[in-house]
Amino acid sequence: MKNKRRTYFFQFAVLAVVIATAYFAWNYFKASTISEEKSAQASKSLQDLKYLLQPPVQVATAKIQSVPHYLGGLGTVQAANTVTVTSLVAGQLTALHFDEGQFVKQGDLLAEIDPRSFQIQLAKVQGQYAKDQATLANSRQDLVRYQQLAKNKSISQQDLDKQISTVRQYEALLKADQSSIDDARLQLTYSRITAPISGRVGLKKIDVGNYISAGGGTPLVIITQVDPIDVLFALPENDISAVLKAQKNNKDVVVTAWDRNNQQQLAQGKLLSIDNLIDVTTGTIKMKARFDNQNNVLFPNQFVNIQIKVNTLENAIVIPNAALQMSSEGHYVWKVDKENKVNKRKVTIGLQNAQLVVISKGLATGDRVVTDGTDALTEGTGITIVKPLKSESANTYDQMDKSKPSNSKVENT
């Protein structure tokens, strides 16, 4: 009985020790967690205070680079040449030798018209030629006899002259017959319709078996020359002088075609021609550029964005466009000094596009300027420089001039 009581007592004591240990461990862990949270909150408060006193900003460094000067506009792709194929002779269409949408070369057979009537006409005029040729030969023989008789005074000079005239008439008639033969052969040739230019054929306008008329009454198909291919676009009249100067300085003025969203370069070509007058309703002038189109990336009536390079500014000091600020006094930037304090610096800008701006006056190479976080800045404010997120730095400042197209404009303010 005593042994059983001792066992119960021992078990109770062990359980009490375990409970007490767990209780003290839990309190220690709770106190430690609260301490860490308070420490983190205190650290965050210090960081917030630091950002309040020294606001976080992103900066970029002014650098020297070559800046291309582009002019841009919206253009429409058009075929270099467009031909509506028609028949030059009338007749029944007996065959088509093309598939809709295929490419053809100049001289390829497109269609055939029933040639029998033209073959008959050719045979007819050839027969007439043979008949008149025989008559001419007989008249020439008579002329030889007349000449002999005239020497013997057997016939009058009038009779001889008459025979000479007859021979000449038949000679002229033979020439007319030859012309008729040539015309008949030509008409027979026209019964085989060939491609007048190389290009892409469109949808057929008439089916086999139908009667096709001569001239432009019944078109057969339309062929568009798409390699090379042209783009028609317009620029403001103020840009004419820059384009003409570029033409004078360069044999070929480079023109680039981009897609509708200015995301993908489609083709690069050259300026082909400039219109001779300004559209008074829009204040623009039309221009045409020509592109190689072997890959068929340009299609007639397609809308594209055009970039025309008129100049390149060498050794220019540039900064990101985001760093440029504007006030009633003009353009300025927030320049960062060696102590990471900012000062407002008035600048004069030159060439500017969507990515960067040329600084003509006010900054030097290596100067740091604030690009993001300018709202909280005042003269002499200390700053905390932070790096941009990866998503924000995907298109870096060093790549800004190469990433996507943008129109350029020149300012001096």
UniProtKB/Swiss-Prot annotation:
<dbReference type="GO" id="GO:0015562">
    <property type="term" value="F:efflux transmembrane transporter activity"/>
</dbReference>
<dbReference type="GO" id="GO:1990281">
    <property type="term" value="C:efflux pump complex"/>
</dbReference>
<protein>
    <recommendedName>
        <fullName>Multidrug resistance protein MdtA</fullName>
    </recommendedName>
</protein>
<keyword id="KW-0813">Transport</keyword>
<dbReference type="InterPro" id="IPR022824">
    <property type="entry name" value="Multidrug-R_MdtA"/>
</dbReference>
<keyword id="KW-1003">Cell membrane</keyword>
<comment type="similarity">
    <text>Belongs to the membrane fusion protein (MFP) (TC 8.A.1) family.</text>
</comment>
<comment type="subunit">
    <text>Part of a tripartite efflux system composed of MdtA, MdtB and MdtC.</text>
</comment>
<feature type="region of interest" description="Disordered">
    <location>
        <begin position="394"/>
        <end position="413"/>
    </location>
</feature>
<dbReference type="GO" id="GO:0005886">
    <property type="term" value="C:plasma membrane"/>
</dbReference>
<dbReference type="Pfam" id="PF16576">
    <property type="entry name" value="HlyD_D23"/>
</dbReference>
<dbReference type="InterPro" id="IPR032317">
    <property type="entry name" value="CusB_D23"/>
</dbReference>
<feature type="signal peptide">
    <location>
        <begin position="1"/>
        <end position="25"/>
    </location>
</feature>
<keyword id="KW-0472">Membrane</keyword>
<dbReference type="GO" id="GO:0009636">
    <property type="term" value="P:response to toxic substance"/>
</dbReference>
<dbReference type="InterPro" id="IPR006143">
    <property type="entry name" value="RND_pump_MFP"/>
</dbReference>
<keyword id="KW-0997">Cell inner membrane</keyword>
<keyword id="KW-0732">Signal</keyword>
